[in-house]
């Protein structure tokens, strides 16, 4: 069976990617990161999801939190803002996060003989993060095949971003068709220890709108009653 490394945050998109990779016949090696994120409940969710969905293995890598300063997701002194339409890169951007995560996934993949890496990046219904754009994914794939023994020898890597051009509605519809239990997932940028969502941040807003527009019951547990 072919192997794939799947970046698994515990959120909606990465869980959909895990389900999709499994449906394509991959033995999935889930990889999560503890990097000082305030929404650490997502790591508990990732553990539940990996077990529930039958991942071949699940590793949680602890990174030095000093690598990720200056973000509302890692610095308690910076407030996570409520959702607001804006073309600007928000304060929830974590410096070079996907680059670092993919680099770790690449090393792991080469070491276990996997040549496919899955990431839940999307350039639709997102917060203008530069490391979610298709040109970033394409560039990293080129780098992967220039920087590794396997790549140089022609055993090439593929960086799979299957949600790249899907809206949140489409991602939810796809996951629902694949049998994903979204009640296990945590997407909120500031979920409490119980995994209950704030309902106000960018991630919560995109998620709520997605379920509503998809006509799928929202299984998210919220900290308080909120409205779009």
Curated annotation (Swiss-Prot):
Record-listed ATP binding positions = 8-18
Kindly indicate where the leader peptide sits in this chain.
none
Question: What GO molecular-function term can you cite, just one?
Answer: zinc ion binding
Question: EC annotation?
Answer: 6.3.4.20
Could you tell me which InterPro entries the record lists for this protein? QueC, Rossmann-like_a/b/a_fold
The pathway that the record names for this protein is: Purine metabolism; 7-cyano-7-deazaguanine biosynthesis
Record's NCBIfam families?
7-cyano-7-deazaguanine synthase QueC
Q: What does this protein do?
A: Catalyzes the ATP-dependent conversion of 7-carboxy-7-deazaguanine (CDG) to 7-cyano-7-deazaguanine (preQ(0)).
Query: Know the name of this protein?
Result: 7-cyano-7-deazaguanine synthase
**Classification of source organism:** Bacteria, Pseudomonadati, Pseudomonadota, Gammaproteobacteria, Legionellales
């Amino acid at each position: 069976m072919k192997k794939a490394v799947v970046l698994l945050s515990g959120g909606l998109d990465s869980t959909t990617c895990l389900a999709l990779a499994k449906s394509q016949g991959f033995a999935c090696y889930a990889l999560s990161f503890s990097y000082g994120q305030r929404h650490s409940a997502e790591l508990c969710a990732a553990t539940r999801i990996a077990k529930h969905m039958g991942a071949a293995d699940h590793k949680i890598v602890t990174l030095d939190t000093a690598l990720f300063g200056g973000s509302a997701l890692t610095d308690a002194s910076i407030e996570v803002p409520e959702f607001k339409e804006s073309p600007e890169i928000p304060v929830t951007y974590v410096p070079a996060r996907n680059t670092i995560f993919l680099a770790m996934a690449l090393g792991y993949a080469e070491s276990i003989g996997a040549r496919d890496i899955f990431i839940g990046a999307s350039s639709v219904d997102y917060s203008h993060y530069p490391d979610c754009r298709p040109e970033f994914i394409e560039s990293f794939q080129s780098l992967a095949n220039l920087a590794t023994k396997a790549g140089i020898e022609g055993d090439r890597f593929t960086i799979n971003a299957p949600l790249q051009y899907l809206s949140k509605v489409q991602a939810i519809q796809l996951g629902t068709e694949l049998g994903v239990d979204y009640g296990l997932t945590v997407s909120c940028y500031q979920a409490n220890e119980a995994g209950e969502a704030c309902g106000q941040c960018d991630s919560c807003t995109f998620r709520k709108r997605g379920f509503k527009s998809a006509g799928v019951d929202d299984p998210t547990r919220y900290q308080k009653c909120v409205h779009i």
